[in-house]
């Protein structure tokens, strides 16, 4: 029990440091020193497909808060990136090619993550998003640990993805970073990881805690948890008596064609941006500028090009 308690304590400390925590929400910010340059932009400036980043559902990650470097990277590749605070309707989604939703929450959970998870989206909004993707739109849906995964679960389920509302992590006593590679078959071969040429092939990715899910048969796994990862049935802080189960084979990233559109689902948000925890001395930086995440930037560009229809479906 004492070993288990120590592991959970370390787990909580590590994941809060790397990603989310209500008490630290204001001290984790967009990294102003992040390198968001693109050597070979795919589009002329502001001439690419339009990407909307949701901020209308109490999102933890928005352009202004923690996803600024993500938006800057896309703009430097030529994408037209906008913030959207609107409820999802056919009219509100019609201008966009790609919709990005990261870590949405219902109003009841904004200030109390201990409450039971509930959907961040109404049933009507979920139906609208599903129809929009079926008609040719593309969705990037991202949700971290409990209750964020639980708040995205109904939307994910509309596309056949089944989220575990917990925290998936390696035993923190192990000490290794969460790095997924082609060499160990935790990062899989796909058009997204192959990119458009030899210079955009992805062989390694780093993530920072997060959640796991099961995917429908038509989905293509990209990031797969190997032996040694556990799903902890808790939010943060994680209590010592939290139940845990083997997460081997669960996914942290997958893509899928859906009707005329495309869907990408990921159980971790920090990998897509560059953030800094300002109250630590020295400030702690994590995201695509962290050690071991050197290929994350190119992966983001590959993924967005796939969602925008620039890369082939397969």
Spans of model-derived segments:
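Bacterial N-terminal signal peptides that target proteins for export
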Residues: 1-10
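Bacterial N-terminal signal peptides
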Residues: 10-19
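Short, surface-exposed patches at the edges or C-terminal ends of soluble domains, predominantly
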Residues: 24-314
């Amino acid at each position: 029990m004492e070993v288990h308690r120590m592991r959970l304590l370390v787990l909580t400390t590590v994941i809060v440091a790397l990603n989310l925590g209500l008490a630290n929400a204001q001290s984790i910010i967009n990294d102003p020193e992040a390198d968001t340059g693109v050597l070979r932009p795919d589009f002329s400036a502001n001439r690419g497909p339009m990407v909307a980043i949701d901020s209308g559902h109490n999102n933890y990650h928005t352009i202004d808060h923690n996803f600024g470097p993500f938006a800057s990277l896309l703009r430097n590749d030529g994408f037209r990136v906008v913030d959207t605070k609107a409820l999802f309707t056919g009219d509100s989604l019609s201008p966009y090619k790609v919709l990005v939703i990261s870590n949405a929450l219902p109003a009841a959970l904004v200030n109390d993550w201990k409450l039971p998870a509930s959907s961040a989206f109404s049933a009507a909004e979920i139906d609208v998003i599903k129809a929009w993707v079926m008609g040719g739109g593309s969705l990037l849906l991202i949700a971290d640990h409990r209750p964020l995964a639980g708040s995205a679960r109904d939307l994910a389920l509309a596309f056949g993805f089944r989220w575990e509302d917990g925290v998936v992590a390696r035993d923190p006593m192990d000490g290794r970073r969460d790095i997924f590679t082609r060499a160990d078959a935790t990062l899989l071969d796909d058009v997204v990881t192959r990119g458009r040429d030899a210079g955009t092939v992805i062989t390694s990715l780093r993530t920072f805690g997060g959640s796991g899910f099961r995917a429908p048969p038509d989905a293509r796994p990209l990031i797969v948890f190997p032996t040694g990862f556990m799903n902890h049935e808790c939010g943060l802080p994680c209590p010592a008596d939290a139940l845990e189960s083997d997460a081997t084979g669960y996914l942290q990233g997958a893509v899928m064609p859906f009707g005329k559109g495309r869907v990408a689902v990921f159980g971790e948000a920090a990998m897509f941006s560059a953030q800094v925890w300002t109250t630590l001395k020295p400030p702690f930086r994590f995201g695509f500028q962290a050690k071991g995440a050197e290929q994350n930037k190119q992966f983001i560009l590959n993924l967005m090009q796939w969602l925008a229809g620039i890369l082939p479906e397969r």
